[in-house]
Each structure stands twice: as structure tokens, then as C-alpha cells.
Amino acid sequence: MANIKSQQKRNRTNERARLRNKSVKSSLRTAVRSFRDAAHSGDKEKAAELLVSTNRKLDKAASKGVIHKNQAANKKSALARALNKLG
């Protein structure tokens, strides 16, 4: 346990950020998984609308600093390629 007051506050702040980031990453994984399930089943319309919402979540996570912007770009690119592969 930290003895310095500023470090104690920093620990509390970091814990709040960790929980918030964990929640955002979990919802990202769920969104990507649901898109991949739709793409794997061949439902192009559902996959297309899930791609839009997943891209929005990826962009928001990148802008908040939860994930790196290049990671978001790579995931968006891979998901778009998967959608285009459907036909």
C-alpha cells in the first residue's frame, strides 16, 4: 500500500480506469464475435449491419485510448475483408 497521498489517489484512479477498460474490451470482443458468427453463417445483411456497429465501437475505444489506433484499424480492415469475402 502506498504511503504517499498522491500515489494513493493514483491507485484509485488506475483501478477505475482498469475496470472501465475491461468493460469496453469485453464489449468489443462480443461485437467482433457476433460479427464473425454472422459472417461464418453467410448472413451478409446481418454481417454488414454488425460491421458498422463494430467499427463504431472500435473507433470509440481507440479514441478513448483503450486500444491503440493501429490495432483498431487492423481489426476494421480484417472484418471488412471477411465481409467482402462473402460475395
Swiss-Prot record:
Any one of the GO CC terms: cytosol
Keyword set, alphabetical order: Ribonucleoprotein, Ribosomal protein, RNA-binding, rRNA-binding
Keyword Ribosomal protein found: yes
One GO BP annotation of this record: translation
Region named Disordered: 1-28
Keyword Ribonucleoprotein among UniProt keywords: yes
Taxonomy, superkingdom: Bacteria
Function text: Binds directly to 16S ribosomal RNA.
Protein family per UniProt: Belongs to the bacterial ribosomal protein bS20 family.
Entry protein name: Small ribosomal subunit protein bS20
Gene label: rpsT
